[in-house]
Structure formats: C-alpha cells, structure tokens
Amino acid sequence: TVRDILKMSRYLIKEHPEFYKMFAEKEFTWDRTGGDPITQGNRNPLLYKNLGADGIKTGYLAVEKYSLASSIDRNGRRLIAVGSGFNSKNARSKESTKLLTYGLTNYDLVEIAKANQPFHKIDVWLGKENSVDAYTNEDIYKTIKKAKKKLLKVVVKYDGPVEAPINKDQKIATLR
C-alpha cells in the first residue's frame, strides 16, 4: 500500500542513509557477464527538476497504474510524498511535484525541544531539591501548518510531584 511504501521509505532514509544516497544517482553503470557495461538512467522524473529531490522509487502495476515515492531534503527538513493511481508518467510527475511544493509552501518544521537542553522544571517530592530540570535525549520537531503555527502549544505531562530519587535518563515526563 501507499502507507507501506511511506513507512519503508522513512526507515530506509533514517536507518540506512548509506544505501539511500544511491536513489539520488541520475544514472549508473553496471557490468554484465558476456557483454559491454550498461548505463541506465534513473526513472524518477523529480531528480531532473529543480526541486532538490533525492529519491525514492517509481512504479507501475496494471491495477495501481503509475506510482511514485519521492523525497526532498530542504534545509534539514525532509518531505516524503507517495502517490499511485496516476494515468501516465507525466501525471505522476506533475502531481508529485505539486504535493511536495504544497508541503514546502504550507508547512513548517518547528523545534519543540533541543537535545540535552532543559525544557521544563518538574516538581520533586522528598528530594534534596524541590524541582529538577527535564531534558530530552534527542531533538524533537513537529511539522505544522504555517497558518496554525502561532496556535501551537507544547504541554508537559507528568504525574507529579515525582518521587526522589530520580535517576539520570529516567523518563519522568511526556511532551504533547
């Protein structure tokens, strides 16, 4: 399904960047047994447009028609678009371009919390201190519609006060 292709694409990009970079190659040459090497062009039309696309895959099935999973990384912000059911290669390219452009134009990536930076004070019960700084071990971002950006409210949820002792890297809160 389209959702499965999206999940696999995210996994490939995040967990295997060393393989993912191959999807951006516009052509590659491979040796064949008993013949001259073959140079083959990448069939992803978005690689040849001025979008900054760097993958992912094209496809065609009689039932699904033409499909395209495409991705761009613009200033550290990655968008993935997956579509199928297009009647032609041209429609596949045009609609995928429109979808990625829509995402870039109408959405922003907002930083919620920075890794290893305190983001909230948590009340502590029976501790040497009355509160402790809460940290996250990784950067946390949220993609949000630009028109709703000012309405974004981050809520720190915890059952508190948290009983001491609190160990380093202990989960004591959730960001919502």
Each predicted region: which residue ranges?
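Domain-terminus/edge residues, biased toward the C-terminal soluble/receptor-binding domains
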Residues: 3-176
